[in-house]
Amino acid sequence: MKQILFMDTTLRDGEQSPGVNLNEQEKLQIARQLERLGINVMEAGFAAASEGDFQSVKRIANTIQNATVMSLARAKESDIRRAYEAVKGAVSPRLHVFLATSDIHMKYKLCMSKEDVLDSIHRSVTLGKSLFPTVQFSAEDATRTSRAFLAEAVEVAIRAGANVINIPDTVGYTNPEEYYSLFKYLQESVPSYEKAIFSCHCHDDLGMAVANSLAAVEGGALQVEGTINGIGERAGNAALEEVAVALHIRKDFYEAESSMTLKEIKATSTLVSRLTGMVVPKNKAIVGANAFAHESGIHQDGVLKEVTTYEIIEPSLIGESQNLFVLGKHSGRHAFTEKMKELGYEFTKEERDVVFEAFKNLADRKKEITEEDLRALMLGEAAFAAQQYSITQLQVHFVSNSTQCATVVLKDEEGNMYEDAATGSGSIEAIYNAIQRILGLECDLADYRIQSITQGQDALAHVHVELKEGTHQVSGFGVAQDVLEASARAYVHAAGKLKSFITLVK
């Protein structure tokens, strides 16, 4: 049984999804959950892209203990050295250097000859190997590259010291049979093939990213790259949770396994969805809301008689809870702390006191507190704690068929209070206008979405907003039992990010 490594690029490729804008604290939250999931390698970002990216990569590298942390870099000395400075503090640092090898990229993007590309690969990998214990080389647009030249480029990279060779389907162009044969071709055509681990990286432009990844495993790939929920540029990447469960359920066919902690899949998917604002489709495989639902009477009858008639995956395998009541208003601090530890959360005493107070406030208003509620509570409190501004008071004057008025009081990190009021055609517009007046912002609301965390009239609300000012767009979220409060929290979260960006560029 061969062991498959999983390389997660949610924090780099996934964050390139249109409208996704994660701050440092949010990236760290995801990185910690990826560690709990058992991801072998996480691409923390592109350190040379900006100072913000550099700091995020560095913080993740200095925090994660049980996974390799990697930074992307172009085949440029400045990028490689910047990546080294960012991840050198990691327990297991890695460089990911890439260069395009297809004719179309070499001609129109790079303006380089094949000889120039081979020389650049050699120089960049050699430099990387002098700094990093492991180096991964990616031949960008590999599936549209001449196979003979691809084999030549891969051989140069391995001889220069590359430990991992990635064969990406950058534009989602290939199909399973073709991708399988490409890995087999490289196995036969690259003299130093056995000296490196071969990896696959598939995009979903033609809807075959997961199928192509599994075909690569059949063809000899020992590392699979992708993102949680399959997020990413254009149509996204291979969904790692789908690949992992497919390998587990069909061990008989693939004869492969991974070290992924499958019961953490649902929690990871939910966290990524809520922080990025990218909703998981209900019919998505593995983690969609309908993944274990049966509407057909024939199917329901079969499942009631014998669950395996129509269910090949047990919900508990991926950590899908039945949303049972776990805590209530009579639960004490110790029970709360132990339950949160069970869910993977650790606190300082000060953090525990703040979160426990938020829990008790929720328990006073909500009869039953589920695991989903606790995760949402943690997510909301973590976001709130990292904000420049917090809401201390929110008052809305509602009159049917009339202009609405809202009064908002915000507190900044130094404890200064700011109050203003505004009107709007609806309660939410009035709240948002008041917040804009306080923060001195002029921006457009590009998106507003609301989602119920659990069922019932007393369920928590999760609101996602996207704000746009010029060409810059940011997202924010808020969690509360009251929809207006959740909406206000989401707006303050996003507005704080936007205000920081505007201050930075000025």
UniProtKB/Swiss-Prot annotation:
Mn(2+) binds at residues 13, 201, 203, 237. GO terms for cellular component: cytoplasm. The keyword Transport does not apply. Residues 390-506 are annotated as: Regulatory domain. Its EC number is 2.3.3.13. Residues 4-266 form the Pyruvate carboxyltransferase domain. The keyword Cytoplasm applies. Keywords: Amino-acid biosynthesis, Branched-chain amino acid biosynthesis, Cytoplasm, Leucine biosynthesis, Manganese, Metal-binding, Transferase. GO terms for molecular function: 2-isopropylmalate synthase activity; acetyl-CoA C-acetyltransferase activity; manganese ion binding. This is 2-isopropylmalate synthase. It comes from Bacillus mycoides (strain KBAB4) (Bacillus weihenstephanensis).
